[in-house]
From Swiss-Prot:
Similarity annotation: Belongs to the LysR transcriptional regulatory family.
Protein's name according to its UniProt entry: Uncharacterized HTH-type transcriptional regulator YvbU
Boundaries of every HTH lysR-type domain copy: 1-59
InterPro entries cross-referenced by the UniProt entry: HTH-type_LysR_regulators (IPR050950), LysR_subst-bd (IPR005119), Tscrpt_reg_HTH_LysR (IPR000847), WH-like_DNA-bd_sf (IPR036388), WH_DNA-bd_sf (IPR036390)
Residue ranges of DNA binding: 18-37
Domain of life: Bacteria
Species annotation: Bacillus subtilis (strain 168)
PANTHER family, per database record: HTH-TYPE TRANSCRIPTIONAL REGULATOR CZCR (PTHR30419:SF24), HTH-TYPE TRANSCRIPTIONAL REGULATOR YBHD (PTHR30419)
SUPFAM superfamilies attached to this UniProt entry: Periplasmic binding protein-like II, Winged helix' DNA-binding domain
UniProt keywords, alphabetically: DNA-binding, Transcription, Transcription regulation
Amino acid sequence: MTITQLKVFVKIAETGSFTKAGQALNMTQPAVSHAISAIEAELDVKLIIRDRRNGLMLTDTGKQILVHIREVLKGIEKVEQVAAAEKGLELGTIHIGTFSTASAYFMPKLISEFKQKYPKLELVLHEGTVNEVKEWLHTRMIDVGILLYPTEEMEYIHLKKDKMAVVLRDDHPLASHSAITLKDLDHEPMIVCDGGYESPFIDMFRQAGATLHPAFTVYNINTSISMIREGLGLAILSEMSMSGMPLPEHVVTRELDPQVYRDVQLAVPSLKEASLAAKLFIEMAKELFGAE
């Protein structure tokens, strides 16, 4: 197997298309097909199947091999980075996974500062839900990811303590309170953001002796606030998610009592095994946000 063949396989897995993989790698479609055929012939296994409904799909074996091929390619990139560093150069690509709130809060400043200091390093941003970022880290699709609520499989660097608040209409009875307890919300219809936030919320209510009653599950903060404006429920949102977002008329926030924070953290599968480029990115993130 050649490095080019490995890159072709990864790109097909990411794009779900021979044509798009060829365009991304500046290769013809026959060359892409030949690269995959060569890998499958050498390994004597089927890696990719064509499904009428879902298009190109990885086989179970293909999914397992994808993780290891990504590790091989990252290892090759580390070798190139070490050689470049010896010459006084910084080269490489860093794949960063993040959810939308963190993208808006951290990425503009972080990317701007990083590109000024390391202009030859390429940053590729992958935006999804918290659960998708976790999956991308597990499959080594990304080098670093911004996450909430740590898991044992990753190593973490603290970025920010993000304060939570109750968001509700100004004519709701609880709006007269200066602070609201989770017990106060026990029987209230709650609008919950999906994608990795819901389970910690359920645990948070349970620990307070209350029960979370999701009335609606949404994926977007703007949707949540619009539904609150129409009197469809309340939400617990973070200050970071609402920063720079003026609340519409009749929508207000109230503090939680006791105050609740969520930890926003930079996650990597292994700090020791991270590439030189990824370590530079992590150090920059710590410099800019580590004290928050």
